[in-house]
């Protein structure tokens, strides 16, 4: 990327800075059936929900591994994972971001099929690698809007062989045959709060109220990024970077963590809960509670 040039006095102002990052929501085909059996177990103790998983999805996936046409070179392999979550999570004093000053700190949570929700890419500007001394994590690529080798489920594979979702897990959700007239529990966040898909009560504290689609309070910024194309990206806001979006309080039905307080079928006395939405952020980027270290990349 580069910026340069100027405007003659009285001429129309133009944007001389062009980004080389392409907006793309293309996905790889899902036509691979895995030979592994999906393992997901929960053990409830007095204070904890202990989940064990092998991270193998219970649906078809894209082609991964060192074969022609693969979406990335990492083959899917079984994992041996254990997560300990609080049964009665509490809110932190302030929201805790998944992305830290030096890169991703946490994955967000786990689906009821044992696959992690891991929305944050490790792709900081100027795209020289996460360990580059020039890495600007304020401008990190949005995985669902850039060609990072995701399959039709918004998933791909880490070098360890762990399959994970960067966006709404399409095939998993389709296979659930979800009801449109009730709230559907689909997983748990790293802080222990439940995750639901898309729909919730119109009155958050009235379980007899109608079910409606939840809406995010994020929107795409307008105008041109302030960067020079060298230390920070330039060109128009288009969703390629997470920072292309802004949170507007009460723009939608959900808060900055893409959740809200209310009653649910599983929590009739009320709880905080997250919603997976179709629109950005899709998978939340903040925790309302204190995340388990089992989801911490730096532990």
Language model features: what each stretch is:
Residues 191-193, 197-299:
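Extended, compositionally biased non-globular segments
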Residues 1-2:
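C-terminal motif of bacterial Sec signal peptides marking the signal peptidase cleavage site
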Residues 112-115, 159-172, 267-281:
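Extracellular/lumenal glycan-associated surfaces
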Residues 138, 143-175:
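Aromatic- and glycine-enriched beta-alpha-beta binding-site module
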Residues 6-147:
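Solvent-exposed N-terminal domain segments of exported/luminal and surface proteins
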Residues 80-82, 105-107, 150, 160-164, ...:
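Extracellular structured ligand-interaction cores
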Residues 112-153, 228-260:
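Short, flexible domain-boundary/linker segments around small modular repeats
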Residues 89, 121-123, 167-169, 199-201, ...:
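A mature extracytoplasmic/lumenal domain signature
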């Amino acid at each position: 990327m580069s910026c340069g040039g100027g405007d003659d006095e009285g001429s129309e102002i133009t944007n001389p800075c062009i980004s080389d990052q392409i907006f793309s929501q293309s996905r790889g085909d899902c036509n691979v059936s895995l030979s592994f059996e999906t393992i997901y177990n929960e053990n409830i103790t007095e204070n904890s929900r202990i989940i064990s998983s092998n991270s193998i999805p219970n649906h078809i996936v894209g082609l991964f591994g060192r074969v022609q046409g693969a979406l990335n070179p990492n083959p899917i392999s079984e994992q041996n994972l254990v997560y300990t979550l609080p049964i009665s999570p509490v809110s932190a004093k302030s929201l805790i971001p998944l992305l830290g000053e030096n890169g991703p700190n946490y994955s967000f949570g786990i689906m009821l099929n044992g696959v992690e929700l891991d929305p944050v890419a490790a792709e900081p500007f100027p795209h020289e690698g996460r360990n580059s001394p020039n890495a600007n994590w304020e401008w990190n690529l949005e995985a669902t809007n850039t060609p990072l080798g995701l399959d039709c489920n918004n998933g791909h594979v880490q070098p360890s062989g762990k399959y994970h979702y960067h966006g709404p897990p399409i095939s998993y959700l389709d296979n659930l045959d979800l009801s449109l007239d009730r709230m559907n529990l689909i997983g748990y966040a790293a802080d222990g709060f439940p995750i639901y898909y898309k729909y919730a009560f119109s009155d958050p504290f009235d379980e007899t109220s109608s079910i409606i689609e939840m809406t995010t309070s994020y929107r795409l910024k307008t105008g041109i990024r302030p960067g020079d194309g060298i230390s920070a990206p330039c060109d128009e806001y288009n969703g390629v970077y997470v920072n292309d979006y802004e949170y507007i309080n009460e723009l939608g039905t959900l808060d900055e963590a893409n959740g809200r307080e209310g009653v649910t079928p599983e929590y009739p006395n009320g709880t905080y809960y997250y919603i997976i939405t179709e629109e950005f952020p899709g998978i939340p980027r903040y925790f309302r509670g204190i995340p388990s270290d089992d989801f911490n990349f730096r532990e």
